[in-house]
Amino acid sequence: MYDFKREGFPGFPLGQKIEFYERKLPGSRMVVTDLPGTDRSIRTLHSRLALEGSEHSSIACQLGEGDLVSLIEISGADGDKLSFEGLPLAGLSAEELVAQLRERGIAAEVGSVTVELPKLNISFFFFEDVPRTIAWQTSEAF
């Protein structure tokens, strides 16, 4: 079982530049999108990440210097082998995940398709009431 931690993307602590991810993720693809009417752009790094023998889609997005968002797809065939801070994610609805997190002393809120951990800057995205993606973001990101 792979256990995700609050400190960030596995093996990629928050606060790193997107180039750090690019060097460590073989076969990654960078996409740069200019934001109309501004002098800013979003850099998005798409890659596959192996976690204990299974591959997961991963994305790192950077807007500006210090604002990084990292996402990992957690659904799929091996979704029953993933956990967050020791809490198995398989079979948990958004409401059940919030209840379990709160029992562990982690502040959590249910959104329309998310479970937000505002003090940790972590979000779980749900589709059909199944956790599909986990995202970590630096506090500057949003």
Where are these regions (language model features)?
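Short helix/turn-capping signatures at newly exposed starts of structured segments
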Residues: M1-F142
